[in-house]
Amino acid sequence: MRHVTPEEATRFLAADPVGNVELLCALRYDHAIQCIGVVRGGALAGELVAAQEDGDNALTARFEAADGAALAPLIVACPPDARRIVVHRAWMLLALTTAFSLIPEQRSESVFFETAAVALPASPTVRLLTIADAAIVAASATMGGGKGFLDALAQGFRPFGVLTDDRLIAHAIAANATDWTEEVMSVWTAPRMRGRGLATAVVATTAADILRRNRTAIYVAAVTNLASQRVAVKTGFQRAYETLAYRRLR
Protein backbone atom coordinates (compact mmCIF):
# COMPACT_ATOMS: atom_id res chain seq x y z
CA MET A 1 0.00 0.00 0.00
CA ARG A 2 1.28 3.46 -0.87
CA HIS A 3 0.29 7.01 -1.67
CA VAL A 4 -0.57 7.47 -5.34
CA THR A 5 -0.62 10.58 -7.47
CA PRO A 6 -3.92 11.98 -8.78
CA GLU A 7 -2.79 10.93 -12.26
CA GLU A 8 -2.27 7.32 -11.13
CA ALA A 9 -5.57 7.39 -9.30
CA THR A 10 -7.39 8.67 -12.36
CA ARG A 11 -5.97 5.94 -14.59
CA PHE A 12 -7.14 3.27 -12.15
CA LEU A 13 -10.63 4.73 -11.81
CA ALA A 14 -10.98 5.09 -15.59
CA ALA A 15 -11.76 1.37 -15.79
CA ASP A 16 -15.32 2.39 -14.83
CA PRO A 17 -15.70 6.14 -15.39
CA VAL A 18 -19.45 6.13 -14.76
CA GLY A 19 -19.37 4.05 -11.59
CA ASN A 20 -16.38 5.99 -10.30
CA VAL A 21 -17.57 9.43 -11.38
CA GLU A 22 -17.69 10.83 -7.84
CA LEU A 23 -14.11 9.74 -7.14
CA LEU A 24 -12.95 11.20 -10.44
CA CYS A 25 -14.73 14.48 -9.71
CA ALA A 26 -13.20 14.57 -6.23
CA LEU A 27 -9.75 14.33 -7.79
CA ARG A 28 -10.55 17.20 -10.15
CA TYR A 29 -12.66 19.59 -8.07
CA ASP A 30 -12.17 18.96 -4.33
CA HIS A 31 -9.46 20.13 -1.93
CA ALA A 32 -6.88 18.61 0.45
CA ILE A 33 -6.90 15.43 -1.62
CA GLN A 34 -5.35 12.23 -0.26
CA CYS A 35 -4.98 9.16 -2.50
CA ILE A 36 -3.90 5.79 -1.11
CA GLY A 37 -3.59 2.69 -3.27
CA VAL A 38 -3.22 -1.05 -2.80
CA VAL A 39 -0.77 -2.61 -5.24
CA ARG A 40 -1.09 -6.21 -6.38
CA GLY A 41 1.18 -7.75 -8.99
CA GLY A 42 2.66 -4.36 -9.77
CA ALA A 43 -0.71 -2.73 -10.50
CA LEU A 44 -3.29 -0.91 -8.42
CA ALA A 45 -6.05 -3.17 -7.10
CA GLY A 46 -7.76 -0.68 -4.84
CA GLU A 47 -7.86 2.99 -4.03
CA LEU A 48 -9.02 5.39 -1.35
CA VAL A 49 -9.75 9.01 -2.26
CA ALA A 50 -10.32 11.37 0.67
CA ALA A 51 -10.91 15.05 -0.01
CA GLN A 52 -12.65 18.18 1.23
CA GLU A 53 -15.78 19.11 -0.67
CA ASP A 54 -16.79 22.75 -1.00
CA GLY A 55 -18.36 23.98 2.23
CA ASP A 56 -17.16 21.04 4.34
CA ASN A 57 -14.00 21.24 6.45
CA ALA A 58 -13.96 17.50 7.08
CA LEU A 59 -12.80 14.93 4.57
CA THR A 60 -15.16 12.74 2.55
CA ALA A 61 -13.76 9.27 1.84
CA ARG A 62 -14.63 7.08 -1.13
CA PHE A 63 -13.29 3.62 -1.95
CA GLU A 64 -12.81 1.60 -5.12
CA ALA A 65 -11.39 -1.91 -4.99
CA ALA A 66 -11.22 -5.06 -7.06
CA ASP A 67 -12.33 -7.21 -4.11
CA GLY A 68 -12.52 -7.46 -0.34
CA ALA A 69 -8.83 -8.28 0.00
CA ALA A 70 -7.96 -4.98 -1.66
CA LEU A 71 -10.57 -3.05 0.32
CA ALA A 72 -9.46 -4.23 3.78
CA PRO A 73 -6.14 -2.34 4.00
CA LEU A 74 -7.76 0.79 2.57
CA ILE A 75 -10.27 0.74 5.42
CA VAL A 76 -7.38 0.59 7.91
CA ALA A 77 -5.67 3.49 6.12
CA CYS A 78 -8.76 5.73 6.09
CA PRO A 79 -7.74 9.09 7.61
CA PRO A 80 -9.25 9.69 11.07
CA ASP A 81 -10.47 13.12 9.98
CA ALA A 82 -12.57 11.58 7.20
CA ARG A 83 -15.95 12.22 8.84
CA ARG A 84 -18.09 11.33 5.83
CA ILE A 85 -18.03 8.12 3.81
CA VAL A 86 -19.83 7.65 0.50
CA VAL A 87 -20.46 4.12 -0.76
CA HIS A 88 -21.07 3.44 -4.45
CA ARG A 89 -20.48 -0.33 -4.49
CA ALA A 90 -23.14 -2.34 -2.66
CA TRP A 91 -20.75 -5.18 -1.88
CA MET A 92 -18.52 -2.82 0.16
CA LEU A 93 -21.29 -1.79 2.53
CA LEU A 94 -20.97 -4.64 5.04
CA ALA A 95 -17.20 -4.22 5.40
CA LEU A 96 -17.45 -0.45 5.83
CA THR A 97 -20.32 -0.51 8.32
CA THR A 98 -18.52 -3.21 10.30
CA ALA A 99 -15.25 -1.28 10.42
CA PHE A 100 -16.68 2.16 11.22
CA SER A 101 -19.43 3.53 13.42
CA LEU A 102 -21.62 5.12 10.75
CA ILE A 103 -24.89 7.03 10.79
CA PRO A 104 -26.79 7.37 7.49
CA GLU A 105 -27.22 10.93 6.32
CA GLN A 106 -30.88 11.77 5.97
CA ARG A 107 -32.03 11.87 2.35
CA SER A 108 -28.50 11.07 1.27
CA GLU A 109 -29.28 8.26 -1.13
CA SER A 110 -28.72 9.24 -4.75
CA VAL A 111 -29.62 7.47 -7.97
CA PHE A 112 -27.14 7.82 -10.83
CA PHE A 113 -28.36 7.65 -14.42
CA GLU A 114 -26.40 7.55 -17.66
CA THR A 115 -27.25 7.86 -21.34
CA ALA A 116 -25.56 7.67 -24.71
CA ALA A 117 -28.53 9.03 -26.67
CA VAL A 118 -31.44 11.42 -26.10
CA ALA A 119 -34.52 12.49 -28.03
CA LEU A 120 -34.83 16.26 -28.39
CA PRO A 121 -38.40 17.63 -28.17
CA ALA A 122 -39.58 19.89 -30.99
CA SER A 123 -40.43 22.65 -28.52
CA PRO A 124 -39.85 24.77 -26.52
CA THR A 125 -36.71 26.49 -27.76
CA VAL A 126 -33.76 25.83 -25.45
CA ARG A 127 -30.49 27.65 -25.99
CA LEU A 128 -27.05 28.04 -24.48
CA LEU A 129 -26.90 30.92 -22.00
CA THR A 130 -23.92 33.29 -22.09
CA ILE A 131 -22.60 36.28 -20.21
CA ALA A 132 -24.92 38.42 -22.35
CA ASP A 133 -27.85 36.82 -20.51
CA ALA A 134 -26.57 37.75 -17.04
CA ALA A 135 -29.08 40.56 -16.51
CA ILE A 136 -32.03 38.37 -17.50
CA VAL A 137 -30.87 35.56 -15.23
CA ALA A 138 -30.38 37.98 -12.34
CA ALA A 139 -33.92 39.31 -12.82
CA SER A 140 -35.43 35.83 -12.85
CA ALA A 141 -36.45 33.79 -9.83
CA THR A 142 -33.94 31.06 -10.56
CA MET A 143 -32.43 28.73 -8.00
CA GLY A 144 -28.92 30.03 -8.57
CA GLY A 145 -29.68 33.69 -9.26
CA GLY A 146 -27.25 36.02 -10.95
CA LYS A 147 -24.22 35.16 -8.81
CA GLY A 148 -24.71 31.44 -9.28
CA PHE A 149 -24.93 31.94 -13.03
CA LEU A 150 -21.70 33.95 -13.17
CA ASP A 151 -19.94 31.40 -10.96
CA ALA A 152 -21.07 28.61 -13.30
CA LEU A 153 -19.69 30.42 -16.34
CA ALA A 154 -16.40 31.13 -14.53
CA GLN A 155 -15.98 27.40 -13.88
CA GLY A 156 -16.50 26.58 -17.54
CA PHE A 157 -19.96 25.08 -17.03
CA ARG A 158 -22.47 25.26 -19.89
CA PRO A 159 -25.95 26.50 -18.84
CA PHE A 160 -28.99 26.05 -21.07
CA GLY A 161 -32.36 27.70 -20.63
CA VAL A 162 -35.82 28.58 -21.88
CA LEU A 163 -36.57 32.31 -21.96
CA THR A 164 -39.86 34.14 -22.41
CA ASP A 165 -40.77 37.79 -21.91
CA ASP A 166 -37.22 38.58 -20.83
CA ARG A 167 -37.38 36.01 -18.05
CA LEU A 168 -35.62 32.68 -17.64
CA ILE A 169 -38.30 30.09 -16.91
CA ALA A 170 -36.28 26.84 -16.98
CA HIS A 171 -32.63 25.85 -16.96
CA ALA A 172 -30.10 23.03 -16.61
CA ILE A 173 -26.31 23.05 -16.59
CA ALA A 174 -23.65 20.76 -18.04
CA ALA A 175 -21.06 20.60 -15.27
CA ASN A 176 -18.60 18.50 -13.28
CA ALA A 177 -16.80 17.18 -16.33
CA THR A 178 -14.26 14.38 -16.26
CA ASP A 179 -12.38 13.10 -19.30
CA TRP A 180 -15.25 10.65 -19.89
CA THR A 181 -18.43 12.05 -18.36
CA GLU A 182 -20.31 15.26 -17.63
CA GLU A 183 -23.33 15.81 -15.41
CA VAL A 184 -26.68 17.39 -16.19
CA MET A 185 -27.39 19.33 -13.01
CA SER A 186 -29.15 22.37 -11.53
CA VAL A 187 -32.40 21.48 -13.27
CA TRP A 188 -35.03 24.11 -12.48
CA THR A 189 -38.41 25.27 -13.74
CA ALA A 190 -40.29 28.38 -12.61
CA PRO A 191 -43.15 27.22 -10.35
CA ARG A 192 -45.88 28.75 -12.51
CA MET A 193 -44.52 26.96 -15.59
CA ARG A 194 -44.24 23.43 -14.21
CA GLY A 195 -46.05 20.53 -15.82
CA ARG A 196 -45.37 21.75 -19.37
CA GLY A 197 -42.36 19.61 -20.24
CA LEU A 198 -39.79 22.36 -19.74
CA ALA A 199 -37.60 20.27 -17.44
CA THR A 200 -37.52 17.47 -19.99
CA ALA A 201 -36.57 19.95 -22.71
CA VAL A 202 -33.67 21.55 -20.85
CA VAL A 203 -32.36 18.18 -19.63
CA ALA A 204 -32.52 16.70 -23.14
CA THR A 205 -30.77 19.71 -24.69
CA THR A 206 -28.05 19.75 -22.04
CA ALA A 207 -27.49 16.00 -22.37
CA ALA A 208 -27.31 16.30 -26.16
CA ASP A 209 -24.64 18.98 -25.80
CA ILE A 210 -22.61 16.67 -23.57
CA LEU A 211 -22.94 13.79 -26.03
CA ARG A 212 -21.88 15.99 -28.95
CA ARG A 213 -18.65 16.65 -27.06
CA ASN A 214 -18.02 12.89 -26.85
CA ARG A 215 -18.75 12.43 -23.16
CA THR A 216 -21.29 10.20 -21.43
CA ALA A 217 -24.11 12.24 -19.90
CA ILE A 218 -24.73 11.65 -16.18
CA TYR A 219 -27.85 12.61 -14.22
CA VAL A 220 -28.13 12.37 -10.43
CA ALA A 221 -31.38 12.43 -8.44
CA ALA A 222 -32.24 11.83 -4.81
CA VAL A 223 -33.89 8.47 -4.20
CA THR A 224 -36.89 10.33 -2.78
CA ASN A 225 -37.18 12.72 -5.75
CA LEU A 226 -39.39 10.64 -8.00
CA ALA A 227 -40.30 13.60 -10.21
CA SER A 228 -36.64 14.18 -11.05
CA GLN A 229 -36.19 10.49 -11.79
CA ARG A 230 -39.18 10.55 -14.14
CA VAL A 231 -37.61 13.44 -16.05
CA ALA A 232 -34.40 11.44 -16.41
CA VAL A 233 -36.18 8.35 -17.73
CA LYS A 234 -38.41 10.37 -20.06
CA THR A 235 -35.34 12.04 -21.53
CA GLY A 236 -33.65 8.70 -22.25
CA PHE A 237 -31.43 8.16 -19.23
CA GLN A 238 -31.08 4.69 -17.76
CA ARG A 239 -30.64 3.90 -14.09
CA ALA A 240 -27.02 2.93 -13.35
CA TYR A 241 -26.54 2.61 -9.56
CA GLU A 242 -27.20 4.19 -6.16
CA THR A 243 -24.88 5.75 -3.61
CA LEU A 244 -25.23 5.98 0.17
CA ALA A 245 -23.61 8.62 2.37
CA TYR A 246 -22.77 8.21 6.05
CA ARG A 247 -21.41 10.33 8.86
CA ARG A 248 -18.56 8.58 10.63
CA LEU A 249 -18.56 8.65 14.43
CA ARG A 250 -15.25 6.85 14.84
What spans do the regions from the language model cover?
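Short amphipathic alpha-helix that is part of the acyltransferase structural core
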Residues: 1-22, 110-147
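A conserved beta-strand-loop-helix scaffold within acyl/acetyltransferase catalytic domains
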Residues: 148-159, 163-190
